[in-house]
Regions:
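Active-site hotspot residues in diverse enzymes, especially metal/ion-binding acidic/histidine motifs
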Residues: 1-140
Length: 140
């Protein structure tokens, strides 16, 4: 019984380890960092290079290399929001709502700036759903 219990604990850790390994295989740290910086952290350009990784995985990998917030909306509803140090995830910045609206209406990349934030939004649209990925950088 103890061996089975131990196996279940290992299994729980195995999933996390497998996810980390997959991220590092699909988006190798040093290569991804270089490519992200060269592209200006442009999601479509990075997707062309790392075509086996999802848009979501690429967007969240960006958090490791520059302070920013990544937000994903599916069909207009918040799906996931994460930030990198030194940011804490706050509900949202006003410009993010405008960027979400503009990307959803236009179906193309939108870049907006104000005195507080730079927000870039990308459409990842399919026939049956509309995903919008936002990258928000807060100015010092």
């Amino acid at each position: 019984m103890a061996a089975y219990s131990f196996g279940r604990v290992e299994e729980a850790h195995l999933e996390g380890a497998s996810n980390l390994m997959a991220i590092n295989l699909l988006l190798p740290g040093e290569w991804f960092k270089r490519d992200a910086e060269v592209s200006g952290f442009d999601l479509p350009r990075l997707k062309k290079t790392y075509f086996t990784a999802s848009h979501e995985l690429i967007a969240f990998r960006m958090l490791e290399f520059r302070p920013m917030i990544v937000t994903i909306f599916d069909n207009g509803s918040l799906y996931k929001r994460k930030s990198s140090y030194p940011f804490t995830v706050r509900p949202s910045y006003p410009l993010e709502s405008q960027c979400l609206r503009d990307v959803t209406l236009r179906g193309e990349k939108v870049s907006l700036k104000d005195e507080e934030t730079n927000v870039v939004g990308w459409p990842v649209f399919r026939e049956d759903w509309k995903r919008v990925i936002l990258r928000t950088e807060v100015r010092d």
